[in-house]
Amino acid sequence: MIRRLHDTNDLVRAFPRVHFVGIGGTGMSGIAEVMLTLGYEVSGSDNADNVATRRLASLGARIMRGHSAANVLGTDCVVVSSAIREDNPELMEARSQRIPIMPRAAMLAELMRFRRGIAVAGTHGKTTTTSLTAAVLSEGGLDPTFVIGGQLLAAGANAKLGGGQWLVAEADESDGSFLRLNPLMSIITNIDADHLENYGNDFARVQAAFAEFLQRLPFYGLAVLCIDDPEVAALAAKTPRHVMSYGMSPQADVRAENVVQEGSRMRFTLRLPQGTSQEVVLALPGKHNVLNALAAAAVGWQLGVAPDAIARALEGFAGVGRRFNDLGEVTTASGAKVRIIDDYGHHPSELEAVFAAARGGWADKRLVVAFQPHRYSRTRDQFDKFAAVLSSVDALVLSEVYPAGEEPIAGADSHALARAIRARGRSEPVVVGKAAELASVLPDVLQDGDLLLMMGAGDIGAVATHIAVEGFKGEGEA
């Protein structure tokens, strides 16, 4: 029977059961939560249990541990993460049963059909910028839907179905899937060399993908672009779409002036179009976060959010999971008190920005970094940049590379990176195996009053949380 579909209610009635393969991932779990709230019967499978799967289960989703062909029986649609292999038994069964299979980004695009989409793209800063934009629109009374690649701490979730007409979401350039989206507004924070393995190791293809991303805007759409980034500025100069620029550059339409860091906060004057200005205190450290806030302010101003409401949102922002999260002070067995910061940063540019923020807010402290490189291919491609930026800290402990499914690459492991750093003659890094070993090794490196940054996109975040709760182990302890 042919069914006439007019809105999301019709879709839920016609195709009520949706199954997510790899539901525990940040992007997947957010979409699943929105679809649950819309009224879909959501199920999902994952090899690991985590905060996201437990939250979804508490909201009514049916969560299966591991992958089995039986998991997809009776479902109307299967949504798949880009991390899932083609020979996954659930995908194979869905194909044999002719069940529609949708990549994660394609399902996000479907959700955007029923909202006005704001897509946040860029190599770095997407999660924080998406979160700040959602916060600004919420403070302005627009009640947006949002899907974020990290937990918005104020909401306790990475997604929410709002009652307003706008949907704010991250647009993932890593595999080119952001080209599936059709937003009305697009933000680009920066363009850097990352995930080159998905672009034939050709940065020109990355640049072309971002240009195409803007081309997907309708003629009446808006590109919100950071012109402090040279690559984005070059794109802004030639895109055939309406542009609102932001940055600290005097030429930016929305800009920050008089920028000062005060500990973990930034103070600046927000300059908006038409001569409007607003004093702002941002509840995040670092100039990179000022840029993220400017993107959110630009969108807010464009949608009619009052400048004082923008300022309230930025000052009251509670942060995002694993983005310069202050986990508090921990004492080693020898009595050294250290403050732990947990951060997702895993690219040299991200490390550099976080180090600058740490030094700007805690200039009197020794900067100790525990870093878990993420992917052998990234370590290889960014090897010299990693060596340069990691050489700048006061003390460094490296865990082995988190492979994320990759096979080891000769000369692209943590031991090779440590040798390159030693050759620069500025520091003597310590190398451990698994990130879990950091808890026993770090006390030998730390001194009283240190600021400890624990960074990486792998399982080092769980180690940081464990240390913050349980303390350091290994100084004569089991």
From Swiss-Prot:
Classification via Gene3D superfamilies: Mur ligase, C-terminal domain (3.90.190.20), Mur-like, catalytic domain (3.40.1190.10), NAD(P)-binding Rossmann-like Domain (3.40.50.720)
GO biological process: cell division; cell wall organization; peptidoglycan biosynthetic process; regulation of cell shape
Keyword annotations: ATP-binding, Cell cycle, Cell division, Cell shape, Cell wall biogenesis/degradation, Cytoplasm, Ligase, Nucleotide-binding, Peptidoglycan synthesis
Localization, UniProt: Cytoplasm
Major place of residence: cytoplasm
This protein's pathway: Cell wall biogenesis; peptidoglycan biosynthesis
Domain of life: Bacteria
Gene Ontology cellular-component annotations: cytoplasm
Molecular function (Gene Ontology), one example: UDP-N-acetylmuramate-L-alanine ligase activity
Keyword Lipoprotein tagged: no
SUPFAM superfamilies in alphabetical order: MurCD N-terminal domain, MurD-like peptide ligases, catalytic domain, MurD-like peptide ligases, peptide-binding domain
Binding positions (ATP): G122, T123, H124, G125, K126, T127, T128
InterPro entries: Mur-like_cat_sf, Mur_ligase_C, Mur_ligase_C_dom_sf, Mur_ligase_cen, Mur_ligase_N, MurCDEF_pg_biosynth, UDP-N-AcMur_Ala_ligase_MurC
The protein's Enzyme Commission number: 6.3.2.8
Group of enzyme by EC: ligase
Catalytic activities: UDP-N-acetyl-alpha-D-muramate + L-alanine + ATP = UDP-N-acetyl-alpha-D-muramoyl-L-alanine + ADP + phosphate + H(+)
NCBIfam families: murC
Record-stated family: Belongs to the MurCDEF family.
PANTHER family (UniProt xref): UDP-N-ACETYLMURAMATE--L-ALANINE LIGASE (PTHR43445:SF3), UDP-N-ACETYLMURAMATE--L-ALANINE LIGASE-RELATED (PTHR43445)
Function field: Cell wall formation.
Listed name of the protein: UDP-N-acetylmuramate--L-alanine ligase
Organism: Stenotrophomonas maltophilia (strain R551-3)
